[in-house]
């Protein structure tokens, strides 16, 4: 995946996507697989905001049943099934427990009814349907649950993902199918033709600056997509005629990394007072607990977890634990922003999670994406590209009407039996590349059928087969692969997004940061000053500190 902003010159694209989060990535992939001329730019790194700071869930929409959003539940369950089939390395099933306590806003009967509807909407076989559990059943599975007040509960299945890697794999596939993609490329302004779209103003070009070099480029396109998430209205404000209206509502969601108190189970439970719930997932031998849901009106680039968020989440989980967690038990924390479609009068938790497409009369050939979820990102991209194709009559090839992402695996997903593949491929990785077994198993599960590409740098440099300092199963080869093939240009790009290591292992990996910086320096031509500054910047960043 090459970053060549000069490729913008001399090309009029069919569609330019601004924003490299999951919505933009899925749209770029959909359009590229249909044969469109596609470009995607992001002012920061791909998955640099919301799409690396989510709850990591690919879920069937159980939480939406309470809001009677049945269409959204049906869509989410369909998309979850597709992702499991087309990218098994990016959507893995996890058992969820739902303990019910005295005083909860929902009774065991209501939960059973909701899960029965959930099963029916998903057309599940007997093995995947929910189970009703007694108090004793729950305690056998999670001995650390609080016994007092426990009435019983349920077990059902959903899926987890690595949100940033899901985003990256979509962008990689878009680039493999001809899309021109660039991170650290910010749109500065637009030029419009006042009568190009049936008498309405239409964007003809945009000026883009390379944030790494300061060089500016012009990019031309027939259609534009504003998929910048929390920055949607900031991009709209660049257009002449912008009226100051808001299309998205920003709410802050904080997650904390804690010890694995529920083992290999994920868990939902009520947060009192009110009707909110927390979710806790098994994540890299830890627990990932979230989330808060509060309005946010400040700079989207400065969102951080604060101590009030951490304490709120600890109070929520401690209600159902026999041994309460302390702030000293918190291993890490992160905060992201939901860019929800505006719904006047709704509280943050009640605001619809359905996505919407918005068009302004002062830019007839731009659609702004409002809302969206990891789970439904593929169908969002499909519907959006359908709308774009319908807006570009006269030169639309027949292939533009196809829906290729319904059946095309994501990179790494080309296998019919993932578990058998993982077992065989891990053995091959150890034999062919002489890497530690633990690293081989994790790499195969993370990258799927792309595992050999990930380990290829080892053939050039045997040092890249060694685990990073402080890690049992992360190799220098992955750093080199991310730089060469996934457009990792800064340490954060690898630590926060290509690997996610900083979210749960930054302290353990402190000694590995100079080692990674050396690999970046060798590949990108950094001098000693740049290398040392990158290390120092990482150490000062304080990704886990709550203010």
Question: What are these regions, as identified by a protein language model?
Answer:
Residues 32-52:
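Glycine-rich FAD pyrophosphate-binding loop
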Residues 173, 239-288, 294-512, 516-521:
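C-terminal catalytic lobe of FAD-dependent flavoproteins
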């Amino acid at each position: 995946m090459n970053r060549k902003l000069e490729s913008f010159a001399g090309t009029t694209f069919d569609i330019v996507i601004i924003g490299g989060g999951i919505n933009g990535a899925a749209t770029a992939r959909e359009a590229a697989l249909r044969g469109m001329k596609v470009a995607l730019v992001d002012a920061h790194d791909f998955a640099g905001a919301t799409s690396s700071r989510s709850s990591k869930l690919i879920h069937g929409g159980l939480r939406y049943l309470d809001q009677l959003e049945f269409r959204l539940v049906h869509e989410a369950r369909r998309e979850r099934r597709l992702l499991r089939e087309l990218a098994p390395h990016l959507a893995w099933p996890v058992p969820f427990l739902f303990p019910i306590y005295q005083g909860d806003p929902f009774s065991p009967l209501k939960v059973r009814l909701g899960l029965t509807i959930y099963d029916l909407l998903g057309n599940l076989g007997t093995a995947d349907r929910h189970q009703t559990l007694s108090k004793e059943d729950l305690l056998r599975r999670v001995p650390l649950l609080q016994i007092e007040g426990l009435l019983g509960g349920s077990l059902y299945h959903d899926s987890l993902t690595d949100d940033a890697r899901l985003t990256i794999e979509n962008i990689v596939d878009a680039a493999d199918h001809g899309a021109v993609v660039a991170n650290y490329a910010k749109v500065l302004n637009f030029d419009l033709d006042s009568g190009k779209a049936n008498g309405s103003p239409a964007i003809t070009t945009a000026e883009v600056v390379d944030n790494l070099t300061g060089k500016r480029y012009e990019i031309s396109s027939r259609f534009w997509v504003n998929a910048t998430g929390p920055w949607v209205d900031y991009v709209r404000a660049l257009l002449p005629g912008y009226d100051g209206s808001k299309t998205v509502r920003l709410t802050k969601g904080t997650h904390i990394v804690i010890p694995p108190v529920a083992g290999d189970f994920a868990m939902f439970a009520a947060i009192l007072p009110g009707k909110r719930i927390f979710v806790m997932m098994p994540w890299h031998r830890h627990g990932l607990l979230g989330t808060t849901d509060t309005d946010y009106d400040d700079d989207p680039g400065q969102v951080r977890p604060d101590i009030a968020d951490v304490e709120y989440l600890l109070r929520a989980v401690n209600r159902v634990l026999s041994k309460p967690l302390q702030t000293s038990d918190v291993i890490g924390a992160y905060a992201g922003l939901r860019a929800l479609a505006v719904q006047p009068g709704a509280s943050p938790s009640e605001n619809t999670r359905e996505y919407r497409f918005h068009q302004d009369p002062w830019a007839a050939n731009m659609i702004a994406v409002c809302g969206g979820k990891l789970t439904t990102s593929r169908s969002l991209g499909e519907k959006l590209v359908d709308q774009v194709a319908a807006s570009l009559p006269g030169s639309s090839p027949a292939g533009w009407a196809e829906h290729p992402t319904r059946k095309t695996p994501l990179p790494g997903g080309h296998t019919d039996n993932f578990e058998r593949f993982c077992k065989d491929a891990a053995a091959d990785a150890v034999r062919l590349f002489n890497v530690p077994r633990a690293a081989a198993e994790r790499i195969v599960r993370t990258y799927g059928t792309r595992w050999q590409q990930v380990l290829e740098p080892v053939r050039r440099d045997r040092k890249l087969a060694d685990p990073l300092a402080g890690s049992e199963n992360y190799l220098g080869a992955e750093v080199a692969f991310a730089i060469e093939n996934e457009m990792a240009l800064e340490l954060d790009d690898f630590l926060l997004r290509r690997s996610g290591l900083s979210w749960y292992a930054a302290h353990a990996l402190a000694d590995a940061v100079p080692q990674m910086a050396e690999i970046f320096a060798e590949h990108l031509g950094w001098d000693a000053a740049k290398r040392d500054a990158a290390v120092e910047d990482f150490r000062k960043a304080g990704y886990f500190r709550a203010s």
